[in-house]
Amino acid sequence: SCGAEDGAFIYLDDILFSGNRIGSDLSLWIQQAAPAKAIVHIFVFIVHSLGEWQMMEKLKDETIRAGKKIDFHLWRSMTLENRKSYRNSSEVLWPATITADANLIAYIDQEKKFPFEFRKTGGSLKNNCFSSEEGRQLLEQEFLLAGMKIRALCKNPSNAMRPLGFSAFGLGFGSLIVTYRNCPNNCPLALWWGDPESPRASPLSKWYPLVPRKTYGRAIDFDVVW
């Protein structure tokens, strides 16, 4: 029961994107503070399917490595599809085509380890967040081109800094979920990258973000009306 010495543990978050934040927090807990046996309930609003699989595998491995028996239960109100094998039914930005932009084509061609695979149109979506296929493709193309412009502003951009959002592969994570608290870096760069308060010589000053991002290191004033 709640509050009992042998009761379940609860982890609360808003959205599970890559699963790295929850996975890192709970991995550290497993190593340093978790009892030998426990049940953990993870509550979020929305889950992305690839992140769920990666996170649960990570937690399972950490539990085995620690020699403990911990059961994890993930609760959500919605699951959005973003696995590569189900890209035709993806519920994130996943381009079906690209414009004839030389820089974009070169960027795609340089990815050798995980070559980008285009989405085929006509896939069935459980949670259709797009008004139409035409509207979706327009959004994907414009965010792609804007993201490429932003990458060009950076002298040595991180490999994970992709046009459609931070990701280890593809053209970016492609999330369109923004909450009143923050804009995740899994969203297209055009939404959050840049800082109008940076010095003019800084590349960050060259792009005004639509939804300025608050990083973990920056204090958040919850009394501010956004």
Model-predicted segments: where are they?
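Structural motif
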Residues: 8-10, 41
